[in-house]
Amino acid sequence: MKHRLVHLDCLRGLAALLVVVEHLRAFLFVPFAQLKAPGILTKGFYLVTGLGHQAVMIFFVLSGFLVGGSVITALQAGKWSWRGYLLRRMTRLWVVLIPALLLTLFWDKLGYAHAPTGYEGAYRELYHSGPTPSIPSDWSIGTFLGNTFFLQTILVPCFGTNGPLWSLANEFWYYLLFPVLLIIFVSGTRIQVRIIGLLLAACMIFFLPRPMLMGGVIWLLGVGVFYLIQIEKELEQETAPFFLP
C-alpha cells in the first residue's frame, strides 16, 4: 500500500505543477486563439501548459479514492465516527485554507496600494486572469468568513484574487455529502437515521450549485476505483485456495 501511495503522491505533485503552470501561462502569455500561425513547438507548449483543468479533475479522483475509500473502510469495520471524520477533514482543509486567505489578503492589499485599478478588473484583458470589471476583488469580512466555511461560489465569491479557492469548497461539500448518502444505504442503519440522512442530502443537493454537483461525479469515480480494487482483492482471496497444492 505504501508503494502505491508513493505513486499517488507523485501524481498529485505532477497535477499541482500543471495547475500552477497553466495559471502562470495565462498571466504571461496571450491565449492560443490569438496566435497567428503557431509552430509545432508553440502548439506543444500551449498543450502541456493548458492541462490545469484536467489536473484538478485528477485531484478530485484521488480525493474520492483516498477520502471516500477511508469512509467505506471505516463503515465496513464498524469504526465510523462523524466526530473523528469531520475533525480530520476540517483540520486538513483549514491548515491550507486559513493561511491561503491571510496570504491573499496581504498580497492583494500590497498590490492594491501600487495598482488599485488592476483589482477592479482594468487589466483583465491584458493578463487574461484576475478580477473582472463586473466582479472586482472582494476583501470584506463577510466574504472572508464565507470562504472560511467553504461557501465560496455558493453564497459569496472567492476571497480577493484567489479564484482557485473554489476547489476547496467543492472538496468540503463532497466530504460532507458522500458519507451522508452512503449511510442511507448501509444495511443496519436505523430508519430514523436514514430519514435524517435523506433530508440532509436533499437539502445539500438543492443548495449546492449545479457545476459543483457535476464535479462530484468526477470525485465519485475515485470512490468507484477504490471499490473495484476491494472487489478484486476479495476475489483473489476466494480463488486462492483452489490454486494451492
PLM segments and residue spans:
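Active-site alpha-helix of zinc metalloproteases
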Residues: 18-19, 83-84, 166-167
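Generic alpha-helical transmembrane segments of integral inner-membrane proteins
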Residues: 17, 98, 102-106, 110, ...
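Juxtamembrane transmembrane-helix termini
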Residues: 55-91, 96-119, 223-229
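Functionally critical transmembrane alpha-helices in membrane proteins and complexes, commonly lining
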Residues: 6-73, 93-97, 214
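Membrane-interface helix-loop-helix regions
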Residues: 44, 98-170
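Short helix-coil transition/hinge motifs at the ends and kinks of transmembrane helices
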Residues: 30-46, 74-79, 114-136, 232-239
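Aromatic-enriched alpha-helical transmembrane segments of multi-pass intramembrane proteins
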Residues: 9, 15, 139-245
